[in-house]
Amino acid sequence: NITAIAVTAFLVVFQPELRKALEQLGSQNLLSGILAQDDGKSSQEFNDRTVNELVRATFEMAKVKTGALMVIERGTSLKEIERTGIEISGLVTSQLLINIFEHNTPLHDGAVVIRGNRVAAATCYLPLSDNMSINKALGTRHRAAVGVSETTDSLTIVVSEETGRVSVAEGGMLRSVPTAEALRNILSG
């Protein structure tokens, strides 16, 4: 009986840490080598054209202070996040991204998930970071970008609606991206 109480107390006290550990374990493709399945990525790779379209859209939106949140899938699947939004499955173009994030459109709230050269989904919910060191002046969009980068290997582009500044979240860190060329280098690297 005392063992059951101790286990329950342990689970309650360490719930956030256990959840994070399980998320990270679950996000690693442990079976991918064994179950090698074709996910269609080979014909839809993230390429230079996609990079150019993303850079163009990002800095066009920054110029007019249109808030945006674009999550680029890498090794870790973002299917769970994608399920929280609306399927798009459209080729990445600057026009599509700008239209999605246009303020008075139905799709502007939330994030888009980009897989290869496609916008997989829009209006997606992202996990918010618990990191208390994130600047308080930054809003929910930035906290969400850091949050998804803490639990996946994704790269997230953020455009601030307040300032028009562009940032990138990767590996739990948020960094400012001052120029289109700097963003192009990050996306190509």
Where is each model-derived feature located?
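Divalent-cation
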Residues: 9, 14-189
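Membrane-water interface of transmembrane alpha-helices in multipass transporters/channels
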Residues: 1-4
